[in-house]
Structure formats: C-alpha cells, structure tokens
Amino acid sequence: VALTIGIVGLPNAGKSTLFNALTKNDVLAANYPFATIEPNVGVVGVPDGRLARLAEVFSSAKVLPATVEFVDIAGIVRGASEGEGLGNKFLSHIRESAAICQVTRVFRDEDVTHVDGEVNPGNDISTIQTELILADLQTVEKAIPRLEKEARGNKAVTANLEAAKEALGHLEAGTPVIDTTVDRALVRELSLLTAKPFIYVFNCDADELADEELKDRMRALVAPSEAIFLDAKFESELVELGDDDEARAMLEEMGVEEPGLDVLARVGFDTLGLQTYLTAGPKETRAWTIPKGATAPEAAGVIHTDFQRGFIKAEIVSFDDLMELGTMQKAKEAGKVRMEGKDYVMADGDVVEFRFNV
C-alpha cells in the first residue's frame, strides 16, 4: 500500500495552489502510462542528485526517481469534529493518510480574504489542531468501554486499554498524541489523527521568505515538527517553466537554493520513514522505495515478489564508492562490492543487483 501524506489547511491558505503545483509536477504521467490517479492525489518525484550520476556511469536510457503521494483533503473548518463543513468525510480522509501536511497562511493579500478576518498563523495551527484533538477524543471515548470489555476476556488487551486511557488524558489536556510518550503501536488500531507525524508548510510571499526572524518564530510554533517555507504561487509558476535556465534564474532572484516542492517531497519521504536503494543498467537507473530498516530480501520484494521468494544474495556497492572508482569493474577490483545475505539491513544509497532463483 502506498503511504500517503494528507494536505490540510483552512480555506484560502494556498492549499489548492500548492496541490496544483504538486500535481503538475507529475512524474507518473511521464513514466507510468497506465497509472490512473485519483483527481485528489498528486504523485511527486523525490529529487535525488545521485540518479543522474549513476545513469551516466551505466549509460541508462531513463531515470526513475522514488515518489511520494500527496492527497488533497477538502478544506477543514472550525467545528469539523461536530460535522461542520465536510466534517466527517474530511476526518475519514485524513485517517487514511500516514502523515499530515498542514498548509498555513503567512502571506498578506487584501484580495484574498482570511476565514477569520486576520492572518494569524498561530491561531490557524491551533484551529486545526483543536479539531483533530476533538475528533480523537470522540474516538478514544468510544473505544475505552469496548477495550474494557475485551480486556476482561483477554489479558493481552490490557496494554491497549491502558494506552488508550493515557492518550485520553493527554487529549483532554489539549496535547496531540504524537507529542506524548503514549506507545503508538498500542493505539494504532484506533487510527488517531494526532498520532500521525506532522509537516508544516508556511505559505509566504517573497519578502517573508527572506525574513529569518519570522521563520524562526514559525519554527518555534511547530517544533519539533518540520517547518517548510515556500510561496505556493511562485512554486506553481516554477513548475510551468520546467527545469530550465529561466527557472534557475527565478530561484536565484528569490534567494532560494531549490524549489520548495523539492524540499517538501524529501521531507515527506523522510517523515514517512522511507529510504531508497538504487539499481542501474543500460535500460534504466531507478530509486526503489523501502521502509527504513528493511532487509535485503524485503528490498528485493519491492521489485518483484519472486525476487523475495527466491532470494539468494545481494551484490552491493555503496554509491560513494562506485562514484569514486568510476565503474562497477573497478569497484569489484578494489574489493568494494560485497555479497550480502538475507539478514543484511539495507543502507540508504546502496547500489544493488539481486541474485535469486525462482
């Protein structure tokens, strides 16, 4: 199952602008002609400079990056947990996401009204947080009597019950579950919204992007969660231009090192607990997505289940060693290519060829 990141935000925060930029930036359309994508799903390539360099060494015909899926979740309003706006539908869509990306408005623009009449990022963040906490409170309050009943017949459920009660206490105090010591594995079946990792995207205008003091204030608002600063309107203009000199000149002019969408894709990938390994050959150079901590056979299974079933060993060289030596042949001669067995835990940037027997 693809892990997705749900994008949420109050009306007029710039969520749709950001999402449209994400969907225009559509690696899937180019590489997977048969993929049908829901209209509210944006699939974004994870930028990785290693791929182009590998493709050069192997003279690969094409390059396929890892991808992250973002899901556009219809606007949240105050009272969503009571069923206001698209309330309940909204909350069930977030439940399906593995992480939540909240777009928060920082830009001031007389022509774009703010739902509360004033631009106040701190208030916006707590409005959404409050709705998610209220929704979780309802879930936990409903679950506790059921868990109490189950625990009477099955002692193993006692730990889940205790964790649910602990979560309830924190939620009543207004604390998201992710910011507590509650064992998230024990409350996983409840699909609590505030147990998901959060990424905050602050939608700024050009001047604000250069204002380090403002950015520090915003970071402090959401720490320890990741904060990303971008101008959604500028990002969608960049995507229109594609990868050309004009786009690079625009970035330079803004004093930004790389597009905000690239940062968002990378942070999203990391927040989902994912990493990549690389395969390369004349046909393609490709980044494959695996959970951090995956073993070599599990990694092989991402290419094809037969690879996992018939796994014998993996021939592995680190990307850095391969680049330093220039070719696979030289890496082998220098003793940098290793044979790893089924207990090997994959490292980020391993360049791999699997040996299997079906």
Outline where the language-model segments fall.
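Amphipathic alpha-helical transducer elements in NTP-driven molecular machines
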Residues: 34, 48-51, 64-70, 84-98, ...
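Short, flexible surface segments
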Residues: 96, 347-348
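Short amphipathic alpha-helical segments
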Residues: 30-31, 112-116, 212-214, 241
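Conserved Switch II/interswitch segment of TRAFAC-class P-loop GTPases
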Residues: 42-47, 74-84, 95-157, 170-181, ...
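C-terminal-of-GTPase-core extension/linker across diverse P-loop GTPases
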Residues: 2-8, 13, 19, 146-345, ...
